């Protein structure tokens, strides 16, 4: 394992590179309630399957830093690829990381071999949440807009919604997973935290899915918020080469809940692709 800091305009990205550098590269992009440690249990089966696995903390997350500047998450991803000498990569993105993956594939199509969206967001996509989900989202928004916000209270509701799944018992997911996500999530809302200002892709990806030139696998959990599966189905219908898989009995953090099963889905999807580097 090699850890490095990649400089980007106004910040530095904490990057971890594992596996044989001569093997095809797979880049893992974490969710907005997490950092690169969310992928700890997914990396070993991917490395064992013969892939070079790169993951990094996005700006404002984990050990990455940023000034209070405008920036592009797509350009940051390309900066990581360039720093590691990677021409093209498979992108595996969870939630916000999936949105970054789709945006990057539209803006930089020659750098992306394929995408695996894991509970992935799509910029500009508006689903149809249930009334219960709307109430939860309203509660989350109120906590985030409080002055000052309570990081622990925000992390608690994020765990209820995204880790347990809406309406699911706290005992459904092992306590170690819940605690790990809580510890990754809360620092984003701490006093003095600087996250920068990500500049969205324009027009957003939801209106440009037909422009995706790479194959896409969209994996959604059956216990996740309803618009995640809706986004996966929308992607399957609109992108030229996309397939949706709904995995029952898991929620949003699929890579933490069932890493071996997710790794198997990823490998099955990317193994037939022509070798890349």
Regions found by a protein language model. Give the residues of each.
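Conserved acidic catalytic loop of the alpha/beta-hydrolase fold
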Residues: 74-89
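Conserved HGGG/HGGXW glycine-rich cap/lid loop of the alpha/beta-hydrolase fold
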Residues: 9-65, 80
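Conserved serine/cysteine hydrolase catalytic core
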Residues: 182-237, 246
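Conserved alpha/beta-hydrolase catalytic His-Asp/Glu region
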Residues: 147-203, 208
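Flexible "cap/lid" loop of the alpha/beta hydrolase fold
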Residues: 102, 106-107, 113-147
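Short beta-strand immediately N-terminal to the catalytic nucleophile in serine-hydrolase-like folds
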Residues: 91-93, 118
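Gly/Ala-rich beta-loop-alpha elbow adjacent to hydrolase catalytic centers
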Residues: 93, 97, 101
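Catalytic active-site module of serine/aspartate enzymes centered on a nucleophile-bearing elbow/loop
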Residues: 240-277
């Amino acid at each position: 394992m090699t850890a490095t800091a990649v400089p980007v305009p106004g910040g530095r990205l904490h990057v971890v590179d594992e596996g044989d550098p001569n093997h095809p590269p797979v880049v893992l992009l974490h969710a907005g309630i997490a950092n690169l440690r969310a992928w700890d249990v997914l990396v070993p089966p991917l490395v064992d399957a013969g892939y070079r696995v790169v993951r990094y903390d996005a700006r404002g997350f984990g050990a990455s830093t940023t000034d209070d500047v405008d920036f592009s998450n797509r350009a940051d991803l390309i900066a990581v690829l360039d720093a590691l000498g990677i021409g093209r990569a498979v992108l595996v993105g969870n939630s916000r990381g999936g949105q970054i993956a789709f945006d990057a594939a539209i803006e930089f199509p020659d750098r992306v071999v394929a995408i695996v969206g894991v509970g992935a967001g799509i910029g500009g996509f508006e689903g149809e949440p249930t009334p219960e989900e709307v109430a939860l989202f309203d509660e989350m928004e109120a906590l985030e807009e409080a002055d000052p916000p309570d990081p622990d209270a925000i992390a608690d509701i994020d765990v209820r919604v995204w880790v347990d799944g809406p309406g699911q018992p706290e005992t459904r997911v092992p306590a170690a997973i819940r605690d790990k996500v809580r510890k990754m999530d809360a620092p984003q809302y701490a006093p003095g935290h600087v996250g920068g200002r990500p500049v969205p892709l324009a027009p957003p990806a939801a209106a440009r899915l037909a422009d995706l030139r790479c194959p896409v696998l969209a994996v959604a959990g059956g216990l996740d918020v309803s618009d995640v599966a809706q986004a996966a189905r929308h992607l399957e219908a609109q992108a030229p080469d996309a397939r949706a898989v709904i995995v029952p009995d898991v929620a949003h953090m699929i890579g933490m809940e069932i890493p071996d099963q997710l790794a198997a889905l990823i490998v099955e999807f990317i193994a037939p692709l022509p070798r890349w580097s």
